[in-house]
């Protein structure tokens, strides 16, 4: 009976070591995801409402086809990250320069995904009336995709002058204003909200960047 005791102790030790290793491994795996998941409830809803995961430092789900009915994974390569980092480096001097750099990153994204998705055929202000969902983004798609890009920029430490704001919405049927929504940046110094709105622009055109105060008055 005594001869059987040591193996039991070894087995217990192995079990404890395995459990500890599992906890450590889980912490390592969950750590970055938890950091990437630091989002407001409004931003979280952008993803949960269409059953997709938020972006991470390595990939994002690209929505198209109107309300994310079609989707494609963008796995960022080393070349992608280098290109985006170089674009954003030009915006370090000021908040205005950073917003201009973000515009260029969105154009980079449009060029990167256009031939893959077929959105290189897309038109400005596309919606169901165009009967061409497979080549287009609606404003929900552009809001999700642009917000995802902003979250990736934040994860990579490339946003110096701005935080990421909650999506903004507009639409007043009394004055025939079309319902619409957009991604938002918040100037850290002034707290002014700025939209980054790709939907009103065609393929490879820079997204609208303007204050929310102005944006809510436009059609």
What are these regions (language model features)?
Residues 1-12:
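N-terminal secretory signal peptides that target proteins for export/translocation
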Residues 18-28:
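Bacterial N-terminal signal peptides
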Residues 37-65:
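Short N-terminal segments immediately surrounding and downstream of signal-peptide cleavage
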Residues 64-96, 122-132:
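Acidic/histidine-rich, surface-exposed loop or edge segments in extracytoplasmic proteins
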Residues 151-215:
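Hydrophobic/aromatic-rich core segments of domains that either
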Residues 218-219:
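Low-complexity, Gly/Ser/Thr/Pro-rich intrinsically disordered linker/tail segments
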